[in-house]
From Swiss-Prot:
This is Chaperone protein DnaJ. The lineage of its organism: Bacteria, Pseudomonadati, Pseudomonadota, Gammaproteobacteria, Lysobacterales. Participates actively in the response to hyperosmotic and heat shock by preventing the aggregation of stress-denatured proteins and by disaggregating proteins, also in an autonomous, DnaK-independent fashion. Unfolded proteins bind initially to DnaJ; upon interaction with the DnaJ-bound protein, DnaK hydrolyzes its bound ATP, resulting in the formation of a stable complex. GrpE releases ADP from DnaK; ATP binding to DnaK triggers the release of the substrate protein, thus completing the reaction cycle. Homodimer. The J domain is necessary and sufficient to stimulate DnaK ATPase activity. Zinc center 1 plays an important role in the autonomous, DnaK-independent chaperone activity of DnaJ. Zinc center 2 is essential for interaction with DnaK and for DnaJ activity. A zinc finger (CR-type) spans 132-209. The gene is dnaJ. Zn(2+) 1 binds at residues 145, 148, 197, 200. InterPro entries: DnaJ, DnaJ_C, DnaJ_domain, HSP40/DnaJ_pept-bd, HSP_DnaJ_Cys-rich_dom, HSP_DnaJ_Cys-rich_dom_sf, J_dom_sf. Keywords: Chaperone, Cytoplasm, DNA replication, Metal-binding, Repeat, Stress response, Zinc, Zinc-finger.
Length: 376
């Protein structure tokens, strides 16, 4: 099967500039890369075709050979071999393209080396999360070795790796393609230590429990994260440290349930309070408040107390407190109380009962209608 013209593969004119070639290759790579098309053999083949075309056209010598002789320039060894030092750095190109797509960065020497990020879960009571708090925490981490100041060397001297010349990576040739990998001689550090530090044994870092004070802002909720820049693991060979991410988890509360910036709770009331109406006191996170219960209140009725919820950590507005009334059946009744209830119940007869208990009457009518339909 004959190969397609390289310019046609990338969709550019024969006089395309280097920048136009690079943009065309990026478009192709983003569309057909195997990571974005798992299991798609056709997409993978197109991606390889684009990669080969760009490898040739982005190299001045190879491009001139291709323009003069086409694909035959490489089939018969014309126009030079694989990409030398002047060829494109495919690792850098892929780092530019897919570092942004998948959240990573370039793996080449341009990538900034730093310490690893550290995660910590901080459990708080609801009151602490709502009001804000300063909490001391202790985390196991890697810190910079003090005797060698993170260099890993006992005398502070390090040598540039002769294999990678301090880049930390070496270039590997695979036919016309060039790849980069971590230098096996210096393990990607770019330097060598002849006299390792006796404290850290050349690592430049030591394990230690770090104690930190964290200021938790008012209004945080489960899942919120607090970033402490530079409080993660120390970087290798004196490079910058990572960050510490503190994830908040709020414990369940005995009274309140939280929904964003709003709070919910249940308020039990007696039958007499529900029937006759009353004013009841309820707890809020800021103290006590009053709810006026109107006469004939039923279980499930919601009362809204504006501004008695949680102050938002983002907008600083305050949520509301929703109180759901639950009519409580009395227990442990005395003989006199039982007698009074019997006398009260005796007043509910005939149409009088339907008038005083409309929901019960509706339910009974519904059940009767159901059985009538079943037996008809």
């Amino acid at each position: 099967m004959s190969k397609r013209d390289y310019y046609e593969v990338l969709g550019v004119a024969r006089g395309a500039s280097d920048e136009e070639l690079k943009k065309a290759y990026r478009r192709c790579a983003m569309k057909y890369h195997p990571d974005r098309n798992p299991g798609d053999a056709a997409a993978e083949a197109t991606f390889k075709e684009c990669k080969e075309a760009y490898e040739v056209l982005s190299d001045g010598n190879k491009r001139r050979a291709y323009d003069a002789h086409g694909h035959a320039a490489f089939e018969h060894g014309m126009g030079g071999g694989g990409g030398g030092p002047g060829g494109p750095d495919m690792g850098d190109i892929f780092g530019d393209i897919f570092g942004n797509i998948f959240g990573g960065g370039a793996a080449g020497p341009r990538a900034a080396r730093r310490g690893a990020d550290v995660g910590y879960v901080l459990e708080l009571d609801l009151e602490e999360a709502v009001a804000g708090i300063e909490r001391r925490i202790e985390i196991p981490t890697l810190i910079e070795c003090e005797p060698c100041h993170g260099s890993g060397s006992e005398d502070g001297k390090v040598e540039v790796c002769a294999t990678c010349h301090g880049r930390g990576q070496v270039r590997i040739q695979r036919g016309i393609f060039a790849m980069q990998q971590s230098c096996p001689h210096c393990d990607g550090r770019g330097t060598l230590i002849q006299n390792p530090c006796k404290t850290c044994h050349g690592a430049g870092r030591v394990e230690e429990d770090k104690v930190l004070s964290i200021k938790v802002p008012a209004g945080v909720d489960t899942g919120d994260r607090i970033r402490l820049a530079g409080e993660g693991e120390a970087g290798p060979a004196g490079t910058p440290p990572g960050d510490l991410y503190v994830e908040v988890r709020v414990r369940e509360h005995a009274i309140f349930q939280r929904d964003g910036d709003d709070l919910h709770c249940e308020v039990p009331i007696r039958i007499s309070q529900a029937a006759l109406g009353d004013t009841v006191r309820v707890a809020t996170l800021g103290g006590e408040a009053e709810i006026r219960i109107p006469a004939e209140t039923q279980t499930g009725k919601l009362f809204r107390l504006r501004g008695k919820g949680v102050r938002s950590v983002r907008s600083r507005s305050e949520g509301d407190l929703y109180c759901r009334v639950v009519v409580e059946t009395p227990v442990n009744l005395t003989t006199d109380q039982r007698e009074l209830l019997k006398q009260f119940e005796a007043t509910f007869t005939g149409e009088d009962a339907r008038k005083h208990s409309p929901k019960s009457a509706t339910f009974i009518d519904g059940v009767k209608g159901f059985w009538d339909r079943m037996t008809s």
